[in-house]
Amino acid sequence: DGIVLAAIFIEDRKEGIIKISLRSKGNFSVNEMSRAHFEGGGHTNAAGGKSHLSLQKTIEKFISILPRYNKALNDE
């Protein structure tokens, strides 16, 4: 019930990138998050992006930016 944000990271070895799929509930904009941090975009509740970092570094980056969105995530 309390889940507002979901993320999937897919390693595309052929393209040499990490593909990121973001989903949210309510008014939390994964579009804004994706545009700001992962060269992507989409809709308020469904967006995608990419990273040229390794899978591990991409996940670390994602985790490191979450505190910036803490208030918005907790307001949902």
Regions found by a protein language model. Give the residues of each.
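Gly/His-enriched, cation/cofactor- and phosphate-binding structural elements
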Residues: D1-E76
